[in-house]
Amino acid sequence: LIALEKNYFSKLHKANIDAGKKIGWDMWRLESSATPEHTTFVYTHLQPNLDTQSFGFGDTDAYFSKEELAMVQEQWGSMVVDSKFLMTSFKGGFAPIKDQPVNFVQLSYMNVDPTSHYDYEQMELVNFMPGHKNNTLMKGWALHRITTPHAENEPDYLTANFFENMEDIYRNSDGVAQLSKQQKMNYQKILDLREMVNVEVLSLVMAVR
């Protein structure tokens, strides 16, 4: 599967990027799969806006023949057991999306009361993002709102913490700091606003910019 992505599909993603149809494309591997007999990959299409979207490949004749691409797509399909789609919108952060990403990302999925979405976003962006910027272990951070239609008991947001290596993820989880009174108040407030329902760690397989 990785060879097909590298030798064929990544070249088509690059053509879309050069044409201004997308910012970038990443392929990530889930590190803690619930089904160890299978490998879970995450494909990230970075789109400039909702009006300019490109999940297909457009005209592929300049790169591969129709027969060759059909054969490759059939091979790809024979390896995929299941797939799902998730659309998000970027709400803020300091992840350098136009550059090559770092090696690991930790995704945290948040369920937020529907009446508190604005308050939650402000807490993350105003109160917590500055602390993430000062964290020398973290190479980037982003807040995304999940825009794919979903039930109220499913996640509404995800945060992405970017790290150079797994050791830094462990160090970040192990670190304990004494909190000021204001920091304790902010942390308690965000706990009241959201519930963290899942955490995933992904390792970078390849990226196209």
Write out the residue ranges for each language-model feature.
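Short S/T/G/P-rich N-terminal loop/turn motif that feeds into the first structured element of a domain
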Residues: 1-209
